[in-house]
Structures are given as C-alpha cells and as structure tokens.
C-alpha cells in the first residue's frame, strides 16, 4: 500500500497560489489517469483509494491549512499502518527555482514547520518527498505573502511544461 499526500491550503482564495501548486497538479493527474475525484472526508481531508498495478494507493488531500496538515497524514498513516517508506509527501519549495523538481527519500524539514510536524508525528524522516520549486522572494520578510500569491503567467507556463516529468516521478515512486 502506498500513500500520496499533496499539500496546500483549502479555500477558493488559495486555489491558484504557489502553496497550492500541488493541489492544481495532482488534481489534474487524477483527471488524466481517469480516476474519480477524491471523496470528501470528515472535514479535514479528501481521500481516494484505488488500485494501480495490483497495488492499493491512497491519495490524501488534507483540507487543513499547511501547518495543520500533519493531523490528516498522521491519522491516515496510523489507521492503515502504512510504512513511512511507502509515503510520498508532495509540496512546494521556495529554495528551488520555479519548475525545479526533486524526488528524495529521507530529508530534513528544511525549516518547514508543517514538515517538521509530520516528521515528529511519524517518528521518522524516512519517507519520500517530491518538491517543486516556486522560487523565493527578494526579502525574507515577504515569504508568507509570496507563497500565498498566484504564479506569474511565465512561471505557470514553466510548471505546465513540467507536468510529464512530475507524473514520471510519481510513477517512479509507485514502482518502488
């Protein structure tokens, strides 16, 4: 069994923001892969259970703000008894240029409080992360505002050009 978690913030006002890049991308994949949309859960997550190549896959879309997403991840991991190495957490990263993609196992929180919380609740760093760069603002004090703003058109085009590469990374994780 594999768990794929994609993080963002709930609500219409955040739909097209940098923090929600994965809400946009993975929702698109589910449509491209002809999967039904995630079912609405108990207010704190949307979930889709499916089979791919005879393997159960759970897609989890926490419907809490980023800093509270650990609750949904921890609850689902404990309920299904999922091995951390079978978890892929997908998120944006300001330390990577727009469109740069990295898939890695065992990473630090890199200063992300929500990721630090997930590591604490799982008692391990030993899970997969797929990061996509959204770039960094010019000044550190602008980060919170920056990630809650939409991409510029040229940045969105860069992301759109990476869709197949992102899909291949997800398929690579599923084959591990």
Predicted features and spans:
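Active-site PLP attachment segment
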Residues: 112
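Nucleotide and nucleotide-moiety/phosphate-recognizing core
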Residues: 2-105, 116, 120, 126-130, ...
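Short, electropositive alpha-helical surface patch
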Residues: 140-160
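Short glycine-enriched, charge-decorated loop/helix-capping segments at active-site entrances
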Residues: 102-108, 147-151
């Amino acid at each position: 069994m594999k768990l794929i978690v994609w993080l963002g913030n709930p609500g219409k006002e955040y739909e097209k923001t940098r923090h929600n890049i994965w809400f946009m991308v993975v929702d698109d994949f589910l449509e491209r892969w002809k999967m039904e949309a995630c079912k609405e859960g108990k207010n704190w997550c949307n979930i889709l259970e499916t089979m791919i190549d005879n393997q159960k896959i759970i897609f989890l879309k926490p419907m809490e703000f980023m800093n509270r997403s650990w609750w949904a991840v921890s609850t689902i991991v404990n309920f299904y008894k999922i091995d951390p190495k079978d978890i892929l957490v997908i998120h944006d990263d300001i330390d990577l240029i727009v469109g740069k993609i990295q898939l890695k196992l065992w990473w630090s929180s890199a200063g992300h409080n929500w990721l630090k919380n997930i590591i604490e609740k799982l008692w391990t760093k030993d899970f997969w992360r797929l990061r996509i760069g959204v770039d960094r603002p010019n000044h550190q004090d602008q980060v919170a505002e920056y990630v809650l703003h939409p991409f510029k058109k040229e940045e969105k085009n860069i992301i759109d050009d990476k869709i197949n590469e992102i899909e291949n990374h997800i398929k690579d994780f599923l084959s591990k």
